[in-house]
Swiss-Prot record:
<keyword id="KW-0456">Lyase</keyword>
<keyword id="KW-0274">FAD</keyword>
<dbReference type="GO" id="GO:0010181">
    <property type="term" value="F:FMN binding"/>
</dbReference>
<dbReference type="InterPro" id="IPR000453">
    <property type="entry name" value="Chorismate_synth"/>
</dbReference>
<feature type="binding site">
    <location>
        <begin position="125"/>
        <end position="127"/>
    </location>
    <ligand>
        <name>FMN</name>
    </ligand>
</feature>
<feature type="binding site">
    <location>
        <position position="278"/>
    </location>
    <ligand>
        <name>FMN</name>
    </ligand>
</feature>
<feature type="binding site">
    <location>
        <begin position="293"/>
        <end position="297"/>
    </location>
    <ligand>
        <name>FMN</name>
    </ligand>
</feature>
<dbReference type="GO" id="GO:0009073">
    <property type="term" value="P:aromatic amino acid family biosynthetic process"/>
</dbReference>
<keyword id="KW-0285">Flavoprotein</keyword>
<keyword id="KW-0057">Aromatic amino acid biosynthesis</keyword>
<keyword id="KW-0028">Amino-acid biosynthesis</keyword>
<dbReference type="InterPro" id="IPR035904">
    <property type="entry name" value="Chorismate_synth_AroC_sf"/>
</dbReference>
<feature type="binding site">
    <location>
        <position position="48"/>
    </location>
    <ligand>
        <name>NADP(+)</name>
    </ligand>
</feature>
<dbReference type="GO" id="GO:0008652">
    <property type="term" value="P:amino acid biosynthetic process"/>
</dbReference>
<keyword id="KW-0288">FMN</keyword>
<keyword id="KW-0521">NADP</keyword>
<comment type="subunit">
    <text>Homotetramer.</text>
</comment>
Amino acid sequence: MAGNSIGQHFRVMTFGESHGIALGCIVDGCPPGLEITEADLQIDLDRRRPGTSLYTTQRREADEVKILSGVFEGKTTGTSIGLLIENTDQRSTDYSDIKDKFRPGHADYTYHQKYGIRDYRGGGRSSARETAMRVAAGAIAKKYLKQEFGVEIRAYLSQMGDVCIDKVDWNEIENNAFFCPDADKVAAFDQLIRDLKKEGDSIGAKIQVVATNLPVGLGEPVFDRLDADIAHALMSINAVKGVEIGDGFDVVQQKGSQHRDPLTPNGFRSNHAGGILGGISTGQDIVASIALKPTSSITVPGDTITRTGEPTQLITKGRHDPCVGIRAVPIAEAMLAIVLMDHLLRHRGQNFAVQTETPKI
């Protein structure tokens, strides 16, 4: 099975399944000398961790990360960093009914057809449980970016169902279980989740992720454009069905005179491009949004087939998120951090001595 790693200079490879013994990852390319502890990684893992509120899955995993290698006396050594999280709250019997059935809207059918075998317990490798290791690796990247370059990466829930935020208060995001920057919308999100639980249904969501204080020049045209790699990373998150950079699909309705971001000696007048032009960072905020589909793990009966092709119905048992978008906020931050870390190291390796007569705005 290929496709388990991302990045070139800063490379992350994950392994493990939803109901396996443990999850793990290897982080290659982290520069030496970065002060890092398990407690540093645990901060973001706790933000993603299941069972922390009434609004997410009640599977209770501590998600306590262990650093196995690559760190000595509290600092990275420049060698491979090994990370491990043990699974402790598996209830595999919840999935015995789907051993020979395919859950509609999930990867059961495609994994079975591709590999001829699948781990049906919680979706196995296709489960969002795998993203715990992305968050752990992303926490390393986030700390390096912030400490060495002042880059900060933050995300928030901007829409759930038909409820959209009206304002962004960065100080409000960590004050509620939804990572919502608009305190006036928290009650509406709360009621929506409660209604969905009664119905046994789920809902989609939109998340915006922003990186600030980024230097100009990151990105490797043409196939490794910064926005292309960001889209690739964000699209790899479970349930993501759409990615926008800057104004995204709204550009369809814009004229060129509206969309272009005029340059002045004091900076850009706007940021419709989301901080990227020609696949290279402008030094403005990197702004991206992702759309996440509603999970198909619901108690509303759905039509499907058995392994032998017989028609049947399925009601999904187990513990699931009524909106997967809530816990995807720290995952989106992690994936953006991994991409930016990789591109920053690539840029530094090739272009560190480049100087121009044009001032950076």
